[in-house]
Amino acid sequence: MKNVDLVIIGGGPAGLAAAVAARKSGVQDILILERDSELGGILNQCIHNGFGLHTFKEELTGPEYAARFVTQVRELEIEYKLNTMVLDLAADKTVTAMNKTDGLFQLHPKAVILAMGCRERPRGALNIPGYRPAGIFTAGTAQRLVNMEGCLPGRRVVILGSGDIGLIMARRMTLEGAKVLCVAELMPYSGGLKRNIVQCLDDFGIPLKLSHTVVDIQGKERVTGITLARVENGKPVPGTEERYDCDTLLLSCGLLPENELSRAAGVALNPVTGGPAVNESLETNLPGVFAAGNVLHVHDLVDYVSEEAAAAGEHAAAYIAGGGAAAGCTLPVRCENGVHYTVPTTIRPDCAGDTVTLRFRVGGVYKNKKIAVYRGTDCIYSRKRPVLAPGEMETVRLKAELLRGPGDAVTVTLEEG
């Protein structure tokens, strides 16, 4: 068993940003474990632009954004292992992994950062009726086939789900010569960013059918068509069926944080996000185990992933240098009146720096509301927002000094503007 200071599980955007921040914060013995054949994670197949506006103040493609961090990792001489699968994470932070070169090996780090990212919700989790023919892909799989493998999955396409990947693939398939017939969304609102709806659907004349879902798939060897129906109260409305002749169905029905390792180690998970429940330092219930990026909760922009992961790297460095976290009272963070979840779920005011960052999503579309944060019964933050939607994550930065004092909880809520 080898002793190291910091092990980062995952070499995607979160893992890279965390490693760079930890090294700059003084941690020398860092090891990144990545199961793929190259660093960068999902960014390597995201060849569209729109990345880096917050982090680098310029517009980059996914591979360009990843390359900026990979370059920093190499310049800082941070060690990493590719084609390495982490098999187990124990409660005492022992990491068991294997690869072709080293075989089966174990590491005992002082701290661990979870940066495994997320995966797409598959067809089996959607309970779509019909046959199981060829031609049904998750949007991310189709993205990899088109952008990295040079294969076009189909010619006539219907997309179920209006998440950002689905919207982007509607545009990408159109640019590659396919005909995207429509994007169907179960909810009465889109799950993606407004800018993606405009740039990927409106600009290409692709219809977005809200409150619709797939009720049947035709075809045995290959998809020959699908049937959509309008949805009310979560159920298809009889008599509203529409048939589309297509050879491909892409699924963009949400992302699931990949937390099998976390669960095996005993990390407490947030039932809403599916990711670890963390405090203001992005530390889980296991001391010295931190989480950041899409393994924690699904983000809209990779810039926010990098920002969050850098904070996790800095907190891990402080934990390693101090040998543990400082003591202090712990305040739960509660959600009310339309706030779906928050990260973090607990705050230790005495352990926070100058500011505490709260990230959250709402559970529906709200107009002319005010975001309010209470410490006990005292309002310590408020901001008016003309529109709030589930597809866009909200960020609130609180002064840590306002969190100290009487009161048994922090409450994030929506009020009339």
Task: Locate predicted features.
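FAD-binding core/adjacent interface of flavoenzyme oxidoreductases
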Residues: 1-9, 67-156, 232-239, 250, ...
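FAD-site-proximal beta/loop scaffold in flavoenzymes
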Residues: 114, 136-146, 248-299
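A conserved FAD-binding loop/helix module that cradles the flavin
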Residues: 292-336
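Hydrophobic alpha-helical scaffolding
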Residues: 56-59, 63, 132, 187, ...
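A Rossmann-like FAD-binding core segment of flavoenzymes
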Residues: 68-97, 174-260, 354-386
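Rossmann-like nucleotide/phosphate-binding core characteristic of flavoprotein oxidoreductases
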Residues: 1-5, 82, 317-417
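Predominantly flavin-linked oxidoreductase catalytic cores and closely associated redox partners
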Residues: 104-105, 111-208, 213-222, 288, ...
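Beta1-alpha1 glycine-rich phosphate/pyrophosphate-binding loop at the start
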Residues: 4-68, 144, 153-197
